[in-house]
Amino acid sequence: MLNDVPGMMFVDHVAISVKTGELEGQAETYKALGFTEIHREEVYGGDQVREVLLRIGEGPNLIQLLEPLNETSPVAKLIERNGGRGGLAHVAFRVADIQTAFDAMKAKGINIIDKAPRPGSRGTRVFFVHPKAFGFLIEVVEEPAK
């Protein structure tokens, strides 16, 4: 179903939820494995997370660590549902044009959480696909114009 979405390019990143207070330790563990930190940000609005983005090798081989800023964060709720443990938060796919991908997925009847593409971290535009569609949460992301 995703291979029929116009402009679908590749896996952009895998997001991992981490418990409050564990972000720095997790980031250091990935750095010890050879990852390089390329971005760090606090994201407010509906997401309410502290994010560290790490890359290994060339290309978009990215891990995004997400720590909830408070108990109302969707990531805090995910950790709670996961028995108090961190783990897979979502898999993100890069697209060439976010609006085209959004419209194509809507036309296919895919259950999209967001009403429209919205700002994400790093200046990206994103939307999320409900986990019931594929068995896990999917983020669709368009990089900012350079």
PLM-predicted stretches and their roles:
Residues D12, I38-H39, Y44-Q48, N70-G83, ...:
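A cross-kingdom feature marking solvent-exposed beta-strand/loop segments within repeated
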Residues Q26-K31, M105:
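Conserved active-site tyrosine of GNAT-family acetyltransferases
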Residues M1-E28, G86-F93, P144-K146:
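N-terminal beta-strand motif that seeds the catalytic metal site of vicinal oxygen chelate
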Residues I63-D103:
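Ampipathic, surface-exposed secondary-structure segments
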Residues K31-G57:
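Acidic (E/D-rich), amphipathic helical modules within compact regulatory domains
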Residues L2-G7, R50-R55, N61-L66, F93, ...:
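Vicinal oxygen chelate
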